[in-house]
Amino acid sequence: MGVDGSALLSRARAAGVTRFLVPGTTLADSEDAAALADPAAGIFAAVGVHPHEAKDFEPARDGARFEALARRPGVVAIGEIGLDFHYDHSPRPKQIEVLEWMLDCAARLGLPALLHNRESGEEILAALERRGAREN
């Protein structure tokens, strides 16, 4: 949360905010988010790898570490995950691979996913369908 994280929380609480969701965008950010989670204080975490950072995530190397994070108390979602075909900071096939792995992880753990979608509507819907998502 940075140097003034406590001040930010205090101002938010004074304004009536009672719950916070801290999202991870890399494996390291997700570790930080999970460490900040304190359900008794209304602080929760989402762990994930943003599509810009997908190039740095290898499921075979990082998957067990990530899944252990996702199982920690106070982690309530997988995210921010998805596809970003506007900037292409990570190759599109890699973005899709990581998204589908993260969706599988969310399904295994029974957690919702926080999705990022930029200029990838058809592709993200196809990935969701491949991973068993359905309309309610």
Language model regions located:
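Mid-domain alpha/beta scaffold segments of enzyme catalytic cores
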Residues: 1-136
